[in-house]
Amino acid sequence: ILIKESSRDTLATALSVTVDPADGLVIGVVLWSGGSGVEFVGCTEITNDSGQSDVFYSDDTGYPVDSRTSTNPDNSSYLLFNVPAGGPYMFTGDTDGETTEADAPMVFAEAMTFVYLIYDEATWATNPTPGGCS
């Protein structure tokens, strides 16, 4: 998905990030999928093998901020700028020691790639968000 340069730059400026136009943007969400539908998973730390370690997690309004160190239980989305074009890249979510993975087969320059990390009911009977997560 292509993203308007002005939209990308507005987000980057708000987060004090300098955008490299040769790189891409990755956005995603961490979910638990069960019989009753899907739920956000909070307190998940995202890592990946792209070389980009600056992950921005959403606040209660769904806007990415630089003050969170893991996903918000009320909006578990995340954002990475300057992910090198290429791939494939593996993204890992770690929720209190419970991990799940998803791959991004390709990241394109000046484009947005979505990566959904799913904890499924077959492996996790309940949402793995730890108690006390905020």
Give a label for each model feature:
Residues W32, N48, D59, N72-P73, ...:
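Acidic surface patches and DE-rich sequence motifs
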Residues I1-S33:
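Surface-exposed beta-loop interaction hotspot
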Residues G24-V26, W32-V65:
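Short, ordered, surface-exposed loop/turn motifs in non-cytosolic proteins
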Residues D74-S76, P84-P88:
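A glycine-anchored, Pro-Gly-centered beta-turn/N-cap motif
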Residues I1-R8, V83-G86, D94-S134:
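Structured interaction patches on ligand/partner-binding surfaces of diverse proteins
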Residues S50-L79, P105-V107:
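Short, acidic Ser/Thr/Gly-rich low-complexity loop/linker segments typical of extracellular
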